[in-house]
Structure formats: structure tokens, C-alpha cells
């Protein structure tokens, strides 16, 4: 197949598997609705400096990630595609970086293509590409910073070296504006030991200053602007989002130190069977500069994230590009040698996982059905399992010819699985679809009330309003609600009837509740019995008409 044919086929696959599904399912709570609402508020209100969630100060992240999601909504509309396109673009750019870095390291087109394809089809990378959060963007900036570092170190001219270090600084600056100080730490974790090993520490000191200057030029304008606007921003952001999350006893998402070790293997699916041979080859080539650089990039950030108390699966996404390159390099070496053992093992693993998934689905459907009168969704999930099994079988039977078969498994999974979700999951996790069904009833509401931040942000995004009052909940908006001018934005359980009486004198009130527990049912029971009610799964929408004083 010619290069033009390969590129055309990959572009078609990108559109079919990555772009088309973006508009086919609602926004998942809590992340997608939160980021959609924050960025929409920037777009509508014009405040591009201080992040606000539901009109309240929200200082958990800087602003660049919100800017990109807002840009997507500005260009493509305030819709599902517009909210998610930033993640797809960031992922596509990271795939391009994988290709370019592999080409620079090994100067072999086949290896470059294999590395890019593996990275694009890693389960965690492909799955997050259609999900509106900040991790794909942050991962791109970290990837760019370290690719720029290698280009600077491998440069043959002073001009190219200067460009590489400058690009490193710019990428660190944008990474910082996306997710914070980690964007500075991760490149240092790799650059410092590598350049000491290379005995190039003077170059690190000299050109590193240029990178720091470039990063500061990117960061300082916003850093000073947000400090002038919100004097408490940096205290909260540094201590709450960095120190407490890394070392605090009450850190969010606390996990054991070994949490990321099995997750790393799972993140590589459907290529996890190649992991042992890739690591073994990396050990044999441990004195080669490219392998040392990639190993440091993989292992040192992984160790840092493992030491942190707060852990989420997406935190290790910056570790996956070097792993894809090590695996792609090992894969092509085995193809050239005609060694099919690892490929057969990978195919057998995927086939086994597909059969296990099929058996689990059959068991659940017989004992406690996951899909109830949902033949289309059940057909889609069977199609996903079938594609995974077919890819595994093909790679097992014809490992040297069908080495790329796992691409099909991964891409069919990300394209169809969101649409294959059971209705009870969709109803619970994507409340914006329920809100969209009742826009006519909601448009005239004077006040909005919700007992759940995910539902509240879905309501706010669909109605293009930030003034949703919180009903007996605070969550991650506890800090924003602590400001005196916003104390009335949350109503405790004991005051709800009085609040509703006063609010209904101004106009109608729309109440969106998620009912997941006995306390939620009690919240629903406290609402007046008049007005219209609509229910979908565990979501209840009550439209309470205006009352006279």
C-alpha cells in the first residue's frame, strides 16, 4: 500500500471512529458537564481570566483547558461535538508527535507508523479522545515538551537547538495553564537524569534558562491577571490542588502505591500482550540513548504518580507515549525477524478477553439482565465483542500479516460502546439529554434548583444559564459558596420549603433531582405536590408554577 493510500485510509478511520461518535451520546457527569458549563460561561460572559462553575469561583484548574473547550463551542456550536472536539484534536496531535519522535529516533517509516498506530489505539488514549476533560490536552502539552526536548538534544545546529528548547518552554507554559505545576515537573524529571547520564549538565543549565524564560512568557500574563482579579487563587490552587492532593491524609481518590502497575497494562489494551517482550527488548538495549530517554519518560513520571496519595486512571496518560514507542519498536523488530510469538500471545489474549466478556454478558442477562427490552444496544455491545474476538483470532492465526488487527478492536470499541450503554446507565450518567427533551418547559423558569452538581451543570449548559441554586449539596463548590455574596446559592434541607415559597412568588421554579438514595427521595418528598413532573430513570424534573403572595 502506498503512502498516499495509507494516509487516506487513516483519515477515513479517524473521521469514522473518532469524529462521528462525538455527537451520538450525551455529556457524562460529572466531568463533561462541568467543563462544558465552565467554558460556555467564559464564552457567554467574556471573563477569560477567572474560572467560574455555575457562577461560583472554581479554582481547581487554570484556564487554558477551558479556553480550548470554549473555542470548540465557539467554532462548532454549543453542542456535543463542540464540547468534545478539543480532546480529539489534542489526541490527534499527540499521535502525530508519536510518529515524529519515532521517525527521529529510528529513522524508519514502518516503525514510525507502528508507534503512532499503537498509541492511537491504546484503550485509555482512544477512550479519552472523545471525552471532554482536560487530560488529553494536558497529555499533549507534556508530550510536546518532551518531544521538543529530544529534538533539542539531538539537534545538529545551534538554531535547531534554540528552537527545541524554546518549544519546550512554550509547551511547559501551556501545560501549566491547562493543569498546573505538573507541566513543569514532568519534563524536569526526565531531562535532569538523562542529561546527567549524558554528561551534558552545562547544556541543561544554559539552554534550560531559555526554556524557563519561554514558559514564563506564556504563563505570567494570566498568572498576574488572575492574582489581580482573585487574590486567593494561588493559595487555594497550590495548597489544595497540589500539596493536599499529593501528600494530604484526606487526598481525593486515595489509592495504594501499586494502583498504576496493573492499570498500565490495562491502558495498553488491545496491545498488552506485547508489553513483556517490549520491556525485555528495552532492557537489552538499555545503553542506547533513545531507549534510555523513553525509559526515563515512562518510569520516572510513573513513580511520581505512584507516590502521590490521590490517583485517577487518567493521570498516567503522559506515560503512554514512550511506552507506545518502545512497544512499536519491538513489534517492528519481531516482524522483520519473522518472530510471531508475542503477536500470537497478544491475539490469544484479546480473543480470551472477548470470550470472557461474552460469557459475563450472557450470565448477567440470564441472572440479572443488564439490557431490558433494548435489542439495538445489546446488538451493538455484541458487535463490539465480536470485533474484539475477530481481531484476536486474526492476529493469533496470521500474526505477521494481521499484526494490526487490534486497531479494529480498539476503534470499534470507542465508536460503539457509548451508544451501546444500557438505558439505565444513560439515564443516570447523561442528564443533559433529559434536559434537552424538556427545554420548552424549562425555558420560562425564573429559578433553577438541583440536588446534584452533575445534573445542575447539565441544566445550566443546556439552558445557557449559570444561576442554578444547589439543594442540600455543596461538593466541589464548597470553596465558591464560602464567599459571602454567594451564600444564598445553596439551600439546606431545613430551609427548602421557605425558599421555594419565596422563589415561586418571583416566578416558576424548575427542580431537577437525581434520586439515588433514601435521602434523595426525602428531598423529593419535601417538594410541593402541584405543578408538572417528568421522570426518566432516576431523574425527576418538577416544574412548579408561580404563586401569588
Swiss-Prot record:
It catalyses: 4-amino-4-deoxy-alpha-L-arabinopyranosyl di-trans,octa-cis-undecaprenyl phosphate + lipid IVA = lipid IIA + di-trans,octa-cis-undecaprenyl phosphate. It holds the Pfam family PMT. Coiled coil: none annotated. It is found in: Cell inner membrane. GO terms for molecular function: 4-amino-4-deoxy-L-arabinose transferase activity; mannosyltransferase activity. InterPro entries: ArnT_tfrase, Glyco_trans_39/83, LipidA_mod_glycosyltrf_83. It is an enzyme of class 2 (transferase). Pathway: Lipopolysaccharide metabolism; 4-amino-4-deoxy-beta-L-arabinose-lipid A biosynthesis. It is a multi-pass membrane protein. Keywords: Cell inner membrane, Cell membrane, Glycosyltransferase, Lipid A biosynthesis, Lipid biosynthesis, Lipid metabolism, Lipopolysaccharide biosynthesis, Membrane, Transferase, Transmembrane, Transmembrane helix. The chain crosses the membrane at residues 9-29, 80-100, 112-132, 133-153, 176-196, 204-224, 256-276, 288-308, 312-332, 346-366, 376-396, 402-422. One of its GO terms (cellular component) is plasma membrane. One of its GO terms (biological process) is lipopolysaccharide biosynthetic process. Its EC number is 2.4.2.43. The keyword DNA damage does not apply. Belongs to the glycosyltransferase 83 family. Catalyzes the transfer of the L-Ara4N moiety of the glycolipid undecaprenyl phosphate-alpha-L-Ara4N to lipid A. The modified arabinose is attached to lipid A and is required for resistance to polymyxin and cationic antimicrobial peptides. This is Undecaprenyl phosphate-alpha-4-amino-4-deoxy-L-arabinose arabinosyl transferase. It comes from Pseudomonas aeruginosa (strain LESB58).
